[in-house]
Amino acid sequence: YDDLALRTAGTAVFDIYFINSSSVDPDLTFAYGRPSDVPVAGDWDGDGVDSLGVQRGATFFLRNELSGGAADAPFTFGRAGDIALTGDFDGDGADSIAVVRDGKTFVKNTLVGGGADSVLVFGRATDTRVVGDFFGTGIDTLAIVR
């Protein structure tokens, strides 16, 4: 099951609610990143458990634990202002980052800096991209919402 992570607006505080918990209070609370960072979630190390990270400009700071602390995988990819997507785009069992800019989606299959492994021209620049394993293959793909 997926759990729910909420970040309090204007802060860097994350509240984690475990779906199988009967509590109405957060099961876990911690601070990570800066209030202006954009949160991202994924299974960065392929252990089957999603954790959090943040996007700050074109730099991603990813953690493999649901806790504060130093990033396990900081790297720069894309440009400031890009919209981040996460998913297992190559089917290796670990999530990575894609960024959307001007109607193009730039996919990086590893958590290291550098150029995109693939560039997808799909939909219109104004479309919203969503990620999922829509075919049940273990590989995430894109869909658009218009």
Which role does the model predict for each range below?
Residues 1-146:
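Trp/Gly-enriched beta-strand/coil motifs that build multi-repeat beta-propeller-like domains
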